[in-house]
């Protein structure tokens, strides 16, 4: 009976926090249910995760070299046969090096784009029984990309659990779990920071404010909806901060650093932008430990971070090439080396993104101004102490607050400055880790102001807390209701249904760049698909494979001149547009149904 009462009392204590987290996750689930389509990078994530040893879709090479080798030389009729083939291959590579069968193997490369079947497209982005839980394939795929493997392995796990399925829920569920962990970490940080800043009685309030500010933000929704590694990255940045705050508070950097090392390694293996935050946080921590004369902690902390770097590079040595010699890596480094040219405009663009995705420009600007005023006031008081009591006594009164504030603020500002300079595009994904960190700082400021308000007006902690919570839910709820729809791709479901309706027909996708990735779900329905540029369609030598068609769906991507495609289909292939199936899709696509002309039928 007594145990039951204790359990009931414990649940009552955490009920407000639990309700806040559940409410936020419930809202995110509604958002996921509204997602219909994908950004091309999201579908690239599915391909890197699930296409067996085949990292790219190439119209002239549907099956990659390594994929062909694995299918023909490694995969056996039984597991022992597969192991035997793999063993022989390893021996051959070790003995013959460049002359080994693996390294001299050639893929089937065609002179011009070939028809790719619906089954092949399904194999690109989904998992069946033969390639489920094949993490070695994921590892080999991402070594040719510019990202480390952890998120892709998680996505492959979800796809393996739900074989043959391509659904937003597979990727968004990972982000949803990461969001849940992030919200729990914000609650934990609330208690940690309230204890440090002499607001222990407001620890729960601080955590709940941070949870609602972030969990009700459009930034959290965008992070959950985007099936990339940024939800996991955000979670790991907050986890790293929580570990640092706890160890700073408890003087614990000299013991039990396995969790610190694990979070650091996972972050490195998730996204290289993690290094922005990690290195800055480590530098501030090391400086704080040095200034605080915590020498033993400093050396063990440095040793732990070096060990984390060694483990990360040992697990994924391709990271060095990704950062320093890959296309995306050199682009980022070139951006950094370009100095201040255009930097002001980039800073303003990313500042607007952070404001829009957190609490809005006016509120964030007011919070920053209030923070500056408080910092100046504190600095002035410290200066007065210095003049009155001398440097030694003034230094003794600094306490842990300055160090913790540095841990909270400096890495956030540094990350923002670096991401604004080095990001390839002016989009929200690159600053997503800042959203929970910025809302945590705002929650800390609101909690502090609420405490001062209680002291001045005589309000109870409960009253100020309720007022702040209601205000946050109202403001953030209205902003969330006006979400701009990014990453939802509403209307794409209708386009995919169109592909299902005409599933017996082949499809010709005329694209520019690599825009066909956005349409992979459709290509899983059409009988087969030909991926061509407008020039390739006009100059195609294999005329018969198109000319022989009675009916074909032609998908014209943005950037392609519609009239020229129609002209080529009429004059070269004898096919006339019978019906416009889609005038403008969510990605700007146009789809026509072409049929064989009567003259062409007579000639045959």
Stretches found by the model and what they are:
Residues 41, 231-236, 402-412, 420-454:
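Hydrophobic/aromatic-rich transmembrane helices and adjacent perimembrane loops
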Residues 2, 241-260, 264, 276-310:
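Perimembrane helix-loop-helix junctions
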Residues 470-531, 535:
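Membrane-embedded, lumen/periplasm-facing catalytic core of multi-pass transferases
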Residues 50-147, 161-162:
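Interfacial juxtamembrane loops and adjacent helix segments
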Residues 157, 185, 212, 216, ...:
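Specific aromatic-rich, kink-prone transmembrane helix
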Residues 19-21, 262, 446-479:
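Signature aromatic-anchored transmembrane alpha helix within multi-pass, membrane-resident enzymes
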Residues 208-211, 215, 259, 264, ...:
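Transmembrane alpha-helix segments characteristic
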Residues 170-198, 239:
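Transmembrane-helix motifs of polytopic, lipid-linked glycan transferases
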């Amino acid at each position: 009976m007594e145990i039951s009462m204790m359990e009931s009392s414990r649940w009552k204590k955490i009920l407000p926090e639990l309700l806040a987290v559940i409410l936020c996750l419930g809202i995110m689930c509604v958002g996921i249910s509204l997602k219909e389509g994908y950004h091309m990078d999201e579908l690239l994530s599915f391909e890197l995760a699930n296409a067996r040893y085949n990292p790219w879709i190439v119209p002239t090479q549907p099956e990659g070299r390594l994929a062909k080798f694995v299918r023909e030389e490694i995969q056996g009729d039984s597991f022992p046969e597969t192991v035997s083939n793999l063993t022989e291959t390893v021996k051959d590579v070790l003995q013959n090096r460049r002359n080994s069968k693996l390294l001299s193997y050639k893929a089937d490369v065609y002179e011009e784009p070939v028809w790719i079947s619906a089954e092949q497209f399904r194999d690109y982005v989904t998992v069946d029984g033969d390639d489920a839980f094949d993490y070695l394939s994921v590892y080999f795929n991402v070594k040719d990309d510019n990202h480390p493997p952890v998120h892709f392995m998680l996505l492959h796990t979800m796809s393996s659990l739900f074989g043959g399925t391509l659904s937003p829920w597979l990727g968004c569920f990972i982000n949803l779990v990461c969001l849940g962990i992030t919200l729990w970490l914000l609650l934990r940080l609330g208690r940690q920071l309230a204890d440090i800043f002499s607001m222990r009685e407001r620890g729960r309030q601080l955590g709940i404010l941070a949870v609602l500010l972030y969990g009700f933000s459009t930034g959290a929704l965008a992070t959950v909806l985007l099936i990339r590694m940024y939800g996991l990255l955000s979670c790991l940045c907050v986890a790293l901060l929580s570990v640092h705050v706890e160890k700073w508070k408890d003087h614990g950097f000299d013991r039990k650093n396995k969790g610190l090392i694990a979070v650091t390694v996972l972050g490195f293996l998730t996204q290289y932008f993690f290094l922005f935050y990690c290195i800055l946080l480590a530098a501030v921590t090391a400086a704080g430990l040095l200034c605080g004369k915590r020498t033993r902690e400093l050396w063990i902390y440095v040793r732990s971070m070096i060990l984390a770097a060694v483990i990360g590079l040992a697990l994924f040595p391709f990271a060095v090439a990704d950062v320093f010699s890959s296309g995306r890596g050199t682009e980022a480094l070139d951006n950094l080396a370009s100095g201040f040219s255009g930097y002001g405009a980039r800073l303003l663009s990313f500042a607007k993104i952070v404001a829009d995705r957190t609490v809005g420009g006016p509120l964030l600007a007011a919070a920053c101004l209030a923070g500056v005023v408080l910092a100046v006031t504190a600095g002035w008081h410290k200066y007065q102490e210095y003049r009155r009591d001398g440097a030694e006594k003034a230094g003794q009164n600094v306490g842990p607050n300055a160090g913790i504030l540095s841990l909270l603020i400096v890495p956030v500002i540094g990350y923002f400055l670096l991401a604004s300079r080095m990001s390839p595009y002016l989009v929200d994904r690159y600053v997503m880790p800042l959203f929970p960190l910025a809302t945590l700082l705002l929650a800390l400021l609101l909690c502090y102001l609420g405490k001062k308000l209680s002291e001045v007006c005589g309000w109870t902690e409960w009253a100020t807390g309720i007022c702040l919570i209601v205000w946050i839910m109202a403001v953030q709820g209205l902003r969330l209701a006006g979400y701009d729809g990014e990453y939802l791709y509403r209307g794409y479901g209708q386009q995919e249904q169109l592909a299902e309706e005409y599933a017996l027909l082949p499809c010709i996708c005329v694209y520019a760049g690599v825009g066909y990735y956005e349409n992979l779900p459709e290509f899983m329905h059409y009988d087969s698909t030909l991926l061509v540029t407008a020039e390739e369609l006009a100059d195609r030598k294999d005329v018969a494979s198109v000319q022989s068609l009675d009916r074909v769906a032609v998908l014209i991507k943005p950037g392609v001149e519609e009239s020229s495609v129609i002209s080529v289909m009429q004059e070269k292939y004898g096919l006339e547009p019978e019906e416009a199936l889609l005038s403008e899709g969510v990605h700007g696509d146009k789809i026509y149904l072409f049929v064989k002309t009567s003259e062409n039928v007579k000639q045959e």
